[in-house]
Amino acid sequence: MSVKAQERDWLRDGLEIPDVTVTARRPMRDIGVDQTKIDSAMLHQNISLSMADILSFNSSIFVKNSGRATLSTVSFRGTSPSHTQVVWNGLRINSPMLGMTDFSMIPSFLVDKATLLHGSSSVTEAGGGLGGAVKLSTEPTIEDGFGLHFVQGVGSFWTFDDFLRLTYGKGRWYSSTRVVFSTSKNNYRYRNYDKKENIYDDQHNIVGQYYPIERNRNAAFRDTHILQELYYKTKSGDRLSLNAWYTNSYRELPLLTTDYGSSPEYENYQRENSFRGVVGYDHIRRNWRIGAKAGYIFTHLGYDYSYNNVATTCSRSRINTIYGSVEGNYSFEEKGVLLSGNITLHENFVRSSDGTIGYDANRAELSAVVSARWQPIERFGLSATLREELYGKEWTLPIPVVAVEGVVSKKGNIMLRASASRNHRAPSLNDLYFRPGGNPDLRSETGWSYDAGISSEVGRKDIYKLRVSASWFESWIEDWILWLPTNKGFFSPRNVKKVHSYGVEAQASLAVRLAKDWRLELNGSAAWTPSVNVGAPISAGDNSIGKQLPYVPRFSASVTGRLSFRSWSLLYKWCHYGERFTMSSNDVALSGKLPRYFMNNIELEKQFAFRWADLSLKGAINNLFNEEYISVLAHPMPGINFEIFVGIRPKWAKRK
């Protein structure tokens, strides 16, 4: 439940306003939904951040990465990255080849709103999210005239970040152009605990050993992103929109800590050119709304590996996706009923080659969903959703979701929520057709999920606001797809696992005015997520039964705190991931377990207001305590490093 809003925000003006009571009704579209919202203030902290960085410090979900500009994946509630659906302005951007999304390729400055849909709540947005879904969108900032925002960032390891936004609004038109450019040698130093150097005496006897200090080799990157938005609002209130996003990326793949060769002997890099475009139309009236969207995705991926000028891998992939959707909703206000529906089509065309092998495949993916939400009284709501999907020529079983919520006490705004759902995920095109190893006989992964939660929100208007929530969840997933070695010398996917994931997620936020010009905001989240293989052994030597899944921490947590005084702002960010096993048997011999780690970042910003422009100066320290850690086996992470950002927003209308 939310507080009755008054137009002035105490976090900005610090004015004394009398207390108010909480009486507003929860939006009907949110009935039974377990979600985490990340606002633009967090998304636009600094231009060097990707969505992987944002999610690490602002949620309890697991972000797996091996440093900046490297593959970064996200997983909910003990599931895998392919069980997370990602939607950008209505367009699903999961790779049809791999089934997952690289969040390091999504600059946070290109996103205005991000919502995490946990568990069953993802079904309303997309099928296949056995763990959850991430919903990303851009929003118009309607202002007449020209606008400009430029930020220059300089950081350690020869890192340079640039952001430029040009806006123009006149009448019913609004245009926005954003450009993000990042480049770095990324050659930080680290202590290599996977190697030992001997110490010799004068007689060449070994008298000791030490772990050498090395540089991150072959790790440079250069990324360019251009996002164009165009909006038009008709006299009747309808809206037309265009969103076009182009990416050009060159990334070297760093050498592992176990590589003994010199960097000039290797060429190991990947290139990506991609375009994502969506056009939309929204017809909005008092009680009903209808919308239509069409989109297109083109992606060209290139991966090259050579050693001593001998090319051993030259992989090329082209992906074309055509997208269309129609949606609508109707509200019976007097009866407290909201009906909605959506039909979406994705047609994927993939051509992948590596020398003389590869595959050429296409698949249509049709999805339809209907939902009904009923709120007969202010303190109670019920929702039911049914989704049906077609993958190629195969229909899935119906995907139902039932959710209920109710306010059990207005004192403290205590609300209980529960839901149950069935879900599934179809094999990716690589699972089916990759050569060598693809398995066209794979079955879809299916599962049942249950969760229940409690939340409370209290506060004193213009003094403080506190919100806490906790959720319990449980999922059973069958026919989990796993790539296994074969006697033919390559890996092939099989439906082998039955996985039981369960646990608790908790969140808390506090906003408080300490004094007239002092403000404090705290946000925290934590998750305990055992995810265990409970299937039958696939061989006599299978020791994975009853063990935690690899690269799934049982515990994770994050905290952000912002202290503001007039034009000064201090931001502290902390995140923690528990130990992760690298083997399905949880064997800790050699490097079978990655130790837990704690990450601490801090930022200090000062804003300046002149008649002709607003300026900002920000300094950031990452890995404040210079912790030595790894997130992925044999991939070193950077120690303490520094960044400086300078931003400017000219005031065209006020300039004389």
Residue ranges and their predicted role:
Residues S184, Y188, R217-H225, Y231-I290, ...:
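Flexible loop and strand-edge segments within Gram-negative outer membrane beta-barrel domains
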Residues Q375-R379, S471-W476, N495-T582, D614, ...:
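Gram-negative outer-membrane beta-barrel transporters
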Residues A52-S95:
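Extracytoplasmic beta-strand/coil segments of soluble accessory domains associated
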Residues D19, M51-I54, S72-S75, T101-P107, ...:
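N-terminal periplasmic accessory domains that precede
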Residues N287-Y303, S409, R417, S444-Y502, ...:
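Membrane-embedded beta-barrel scaffold of Gram-negative outer-membrane proteins
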Residues L91-G119, P436:
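Short acidic/polar hinge/loop motifs at secondary-structure boundaries
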Residues L338-S340, T344-H346, V350-S475, T560-R562:
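Structural signature of Gram-negative outer-membrane beta-barrels, strongest in the C-terminal barrel
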Residues Q6-H44, P81:
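Short, acidic, small-residue-rich periplasmic hinge/interaction motif at the N-terminus
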